[in-house]
Curated annotation (Swiss-Prot):
Cystine bridges: none
InterPro entries: Ribosomal_bL19, Ribosomal_bL19_CS, Ribosomal_bL19_sf, Translation_prot_SH3-like_sf
Family matches, as PANTHER family: LARGE RIBOSOMAL SUBUNIT PROTEIN BL19M, RIBOSOMAL PROTEIN L19
Protein name per the record: Large ribosomal subunit protein bL19
GO cellular component, one term: cytosolic large ribosomal subunit
GO MF annotation terms: structural constituent of ribosome
Superkingdom of source: Bacteria
Keyword Ribosomal protein: yes
UniProt keyword terms in alphabetical order: Ribonucleoprotein, Ribosomal protein
Amino acid sequence: MNRLDFVDQASLRDDIPAFSPGDTINVYVKVIEGAKERIQVFKGVVIRRQGGGIRETFTVRKESYGVGVERTFPVHSPNIDHIEVVTRGDVRRAKLYYLRELRGKKAKIKEKR
């Protein structure tokens, strides 16, 4: 194992739940405003998961006041307090970019049974 792999291994988090594209999750993000630190919840559908190891990222999409908002998070970021899986989605794709054009009921994802 070379030095970079050793450093990467030490930085990996082990408290991340298993989730995949199509799942609805709550991401609890640490927000620092001046000297204060608070936790902000970002709830949405995972539309992609990309990369591996320390460089792994995922993108969450939500509708906020009729406007689509997407946010990409590193999986092993120290700015993420914790992740909570709300529902498991039943999808047939790994990347759900088609949800960007859909609105309302058409953007609904079936729940896994």
